[in-house]
Amino acid sequence: METDMNEERTGVVTFKGMPLTLLGKPVSVGDAAPDFQVLANDLSPRTLADYKGKVLVLSVVPSLDTPVCDMQTRRFNTEAAGLSDKVRILTISCDLPFAQSRWCGAAGVEAVETLSDHRDLSFGLAYGMVLKELRLLGRAVFVICADGVIAHAEVVSEVSHAVDFDAALAAVKTCLSK
């Protein structure tokens, strides 16, 4: 899982109009999804291999304790009810696992698994999503088909704006039809 942390991209994202720098290697549709290691709410490690054979929605947010991230995670939690059991929705942020667990309990979110990239930014670097100036993840959604290939990749250019839910869900349906 070696990624050059010094790989920087500018001109891709802003936060409330302020330009930010993304660290890590960006991914594109058609790429094999890179592996990563994050922490579950119980502090156990999770890697891409833990979800082998599933269609994955990776909902990437800076922090669950912000309004747009809260809305994004709640929306995917609602959408999960209408999806096949072959689909897993993972929300990844740099929030501590304890904070993620508390937030899920307070929000009644049970259909989305929250995962923390706070420890070593493994996910953020592997997907080119680390906001250098904030040491948080940018906002994005990635859909990975069961064969491990990225079917949808949206990096939101203004971090305070929402992802395109319809496009992500359409990609999930395409993956399920393969």
Task: Specify the residue positions occupied by each region the protein language model found.
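Chalcogenol-based redox active-site neighborhoods
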Residues: 2-178
